[in-house]
From Swiss-Prot:
Stored PANTHER family: PHOSPHOMETHYLPYRIMIDINE SYNTHASE, CHLOROPLASTIC (PTHR30557:SF1), THIAMINE BIOSYNTHESIS PROTEIN THIC (PTHR30557)
Cofactor: [4Fe-4S] cluster
Record's keyword annotation contains 4Fe-4S: yes
EC number from the UniProt entry: 4.1.99.17
Gene (UniProt): thiC
Cofactor note: Binds 1 [4Fe-4S] cluster per subunit. The cluster is coordinated with 3 cysteines and an exchangeable S-adenosyl-L-methionine.
Annotated GO MF terms: 4 iron, 4 sulfur cluster binding; carbon-carbon lyase activity; zinc ion binding
Binding site residues for [4Fe-4S] cluster: 543, 546, 551
Keywords carried by this UniProt record: 4Fe-4S, Iron, Iron-sulfur, Lyase, Metal-binding, S-adenosyl-L-methionine, Thiamine biosynthesis, Zinc
Quaternary data: Homodimer.
Protein name: Phosphomethylpyrimidine synthase
Listed pathway(s): Cofactor biosynthesis; thiamine diphosphate biosynthesis
One of the protein's GO biological processes: thiamine biosynthetic process
Length: 565
C-alpha cells in the first residue's frame, strides 16, 4: 500500500510559505561533534534589516528545500551517532500479528543493547559522557540567550551548555526521549530548567480515522510546534499506523502499550496478562517508540478510594488496570513486574512516562486521596527506574481548579524528587465543552510556571469526540501560548526576545512583521484582513478597532515627536 504523498514538493512549499511566511530553515553546526546540524526557523523582518531564530519542531517537514516522501520516511539523523557508540547490535525483529507490513522501506533488522549495559542517555550522563544528543539539545535550547542580554540582563543563566544538559539528565531532573530504533528523531529535552514543552495526542478509534489521516495530524502538530506526539490509537491497524508515524516523525513518539495489549485479547480485560503486555512492549520498542505511559501506580488497595468520586476513574489505562485487579483480586501486574519492564526499557533507551491512572476527571475530585496515593507510588517507581539507569517522567492531572494547582507541583517534587512533571492541562473548570483547549491552557500556563516540564495539549473536541486536523492545530496553538507564557514567567531569555520583537513591530505599525512573528501568522493576517484587506492597509498606522483618529499608539508617536521637538 502506498499512501498519497501529502506534501509533494510544490504543495509543501506553498503550505510552509502560507503557515510561516518570511521564514527559512537555518542549520547551526556543533562544536564538539562536527556532524551535528541543528535546524532552526529564521523569521526575516519585512525590511530585511534583521531576523530572529526560533525553535523549530517540524524537522524536514518545515524545510522548503527538502522533499519528503512519506512512503519512505525521513532521514535517520541519529543512526551514525548510535552505531558509533559501539554498544548496540542488529537483530531480526519479532513478527507482528495483524500487521500488513505496509511500510516497505523499513528493514526487519532492528537495534538493541549488545550487552547488559544500558544504552540510555541517563547512563551516559552518569558516566560523564556528553553525547551528540546533548550537544544538539544545548544548541536548540541556547538560541537567542546571548542576544537577549542586551535587552534584559536580569534573566536566567545566559547559556545552556552541553555539560549543563548532561548534569540535568544525570540527576533525573530532565529526560531525553530517544529510542535507538527511532534515529529519525531530532534530540529534545524535557525538564524544568529548559523550555516548557508540549505534547499532542493523535490516534484512531474503532469508529474513526485511518493511517493517512493520522500521519497528516502528526505533521500538522509538529509544524505548529508540538515537541512530542503520542499515538493513542485504539482501533484497527494500531501497529501499522504507528510505523508510518514513527518513520516520518522528527519528534519523540509516545504510546500507552496497554491499549494494543488489550486489542490483542479482543478487548477482554480479564484475558490480559504480563506476557501479552511484555510482547507488546518489545514490538513497540523495536518500532522506535520513545516513551511509554505505564500505569504501574494503580494499586489494588487504592481502587476503593475512587468509590465516592463524582467521575470515578477517567484514565483509560487506569480503568483497565483497576478492572483487571478487581476481576483477578490480584495486584497490578505492571507494578509487580516493574523491574522486568525496566530491563526492556534500558535495552532500547525508552523513557518511562509513569501514568496517572487515578487522576481526577472533574473539579469535584481534584487533589483527593486516590490521586496522591498513586503519586507517592510513582515516586517510588521512579527510584526503581533510576536504579536501572532508565529515564522517567511523571504524569499529572487532569481537572484541578487554579488554587489547587500549586499543591500538585509541591507534592510531585516531594514524592518524585524533581523528575520531570508532565500534565494533561489541567482543566480549571468543567463547564465549557467545546472550549476545553482554553479551560486547560489556563491551568497549563500556571503549572508550567510552577515547574511542570511538559504540557499535554487538550483540543476543542475533549470529552466530545476524536480530534480532526483543525482541532489538532487549535490544541497545539493554545498550548504553545501556555508554554510560552510559562517560559516568560520563569525568566527564560529565549522566550523574551520574540515578545520584544513583536511588540516593537506592533508599536511601529510593521504589520507584516507582527503577523510573521506570531505563533499563527495565517490566522493573524486573515483576522486583520477581514476588515482591511488591501496591501495599503499593511502600512497604515491604525487597524479597524480604533481607526485613524483613536489609535493610542499613533497618538503616542505624535507625543514622542512633540517631546523631541
Amino acid at each position: 500500500m502506498i499512501l498519497y504523498n501529502i506534501f509533494l514538493v510544490k504543495m509543501k512549499v506553498d503550505f510552509i510559505n502560507t503557515v510561516f511566511p518570511s521564514s527559512t530553515k537555518e542549520y547551526i553546526p556543533g562544536t564538539i561533534y562536527n556532524n551535528i546540524k541543528v535546524g532552526m526557523r529564521k523569521i526575516h523582518f519585512n525590511d530585511n534589516t534583521e531576523s530572529i531564530l526560533v525553535y523549530d519542531t517540524g524537522g524536514l517537514h518545515t524545510d522548503q528545500n527538502v522533499e519528503v516522501d512519506i512512503n519512505h520516511g525521513i532521514t535517520k539523523l541519529r543512526l551514525n551517532w548510535i552505531i558509533d557508540r559501539q554498544d548496540v547490535e542488529y537483530y531480526e525483529r519479532q513478527p507482528v500479528l495483524n500487521s500488513e507490513h505496509i511500510f516497505t522501506s523499513q528493514s526487519n533488522k532492528v537495534l538493541r543493547a549488545n550487552s547488559t549495559k544500558p544504552v540510555t542517555q541517563i547512563f551516559y550522563a552518569r558516566n560523564n559522557i556528553i553525547t551528540p544528543e546533548m550537544e544538539y539539545i544545548a544548541i536548540r535550547e541556547n538560541s537567542l540567550r546571548q542576544k537577549i542580554l542586551s535587552y534584559k540582563p536580569t534573566v536566567m543563566s545566559p547559556e545552556i551548555t552541553p555539560e549543563f544538559v548532561r548534569q540535568e539528565v544525570a540527576s533525573g531532573r530532565a529526560i531525553i526521549p530517544a529510542n535507538i530504533n527511532h534515529p529519525e528523531s531530532e534530540p529534545m529535552i524535557i525538564g524544568k530548567n529548559f523550555l516548557v514543552k508540549i505534547n499532542a495526542n493523535i490516534g484512531n478509534s474503532v469508529v474513526s480515522s485511518n493511517i493517512e489521516e493520522e500521519v497528516q495530524k502528526m505533521i500538522h502538530a509538529i509544524t505548529y510546534g508540538a515537541d512530542t506526539v503520542m499515538d493513542l490509537s485504539t482501533g484497527n491497524n494500531i501497529h501499522d499506523i504507528r510505523e508510518w508515524i514513527i518513520r516520518n516523525s522528527p519528534v519523540p513518539i509516545g504510546t500507552v502499550p496497554i491499549y494494543q495489549a488489550l486489542n490483542k485479547v479482543n478487548g477482554v480485560v480479564g484475558d490480559l496478562n504480563f506476557n501479552v503486555f511484555k510482547e507488546t512492549l518489545i514490538e513497540q520498542a523495536e518500532q522506535g517508540v520513545d516513551y511509554f505511559t505505564i500505569h504501574a501506580g494503580v494499586l489494588k488497595n487504592y481502587i476503593s478510594h475512587t468509590d465516592n468520586r463524582l467521575t470515578g476513574i477517567v484514565s483509560r489505562g487506569g480503568a483497565i488496570m483497576a478492572h483487571w485487579c478487581t476481576i483477578h483480586n490480584k495486584e497490578n501486574f505492571l507494578y509487580t513486574n516493574f523491574e522486568e519492564i525496566c530491563d526492556i526499557m534500558k535495552r532500547y533507551d525508552i523513557a518511562f512516562s509513569l501514568g496517572d491512572g487515578l487522576r481526577p476527571g472533574s473539579i469535584a475530585d481534584a487533589n483527593d486521596t486516590a490521586q496522591f496515593l498513586e503519586l507517592k507510588t510513582l515516586g517510588e517507581l521512579t527510584d526503581i527506574a533510576w536504579q536501572h539507569d532508565c529515564q522517567a517522567m511523571i504524569e499529572g492531572p487532569g481537572h484541578v481548579p487554579m488554587h489547587l494547582i500549586k499543591e500538585n507541583m509541591e507534592k510531585q517534587i516531594h514524592f518524585c524528587k524533581e523528575a520531570p512533571f508532565y500534565t494533561l492541562g489541567p482543566l480549571t473548570t468543567d463547564i465549557a465543552p467545546g472550549y476545553d483547549h482554553i479551560t486547560s491552557a489556563i491551568g497549563a500556563a500556571i503549572t508550567g510556571w510552577y515547574g511542570t516540564s511538559m504540557l499535554c495539549y487538550v483540543t476543542p473536541k475533549e470529552h466530545l469526540g476524536l480530534p480532526n486536523i483543525q482541532d489538532v492545530k487549535d490544541g497545539v496553538i493554545a498550548y504553545k501560548i501556555a508554554a510560552h507564557a510559562a517560559d516568560l514567567a520563569k525568566g527564560n531569555p529565549s522566550a523574551y526576545i520574540r515578545d520584544y520583537a513583536l511588540s516593537y513591530a506592533r508599536f511601529n505599525f510593521k504589520w507584516h512583521d507582527q503577523f510573521n512573528l506570531s505563533l499563527d501568522p495565517e490566522t493573524a493576517r486573515s483576522l486583520h484582513d477581514e476588515s482591511l484587506p488591501s496591501e495599503h492597509a499593511k502600512s497604515a498606522h491604525f487597524c479597524s478597532m480604533c481607526g485613524p483618529k483613536f489609535c493610542s499608539m499613533k497618538l503616542t508617536h505624535h507625543l514622542k515627536e512633540h517631546s523631541t521637538g
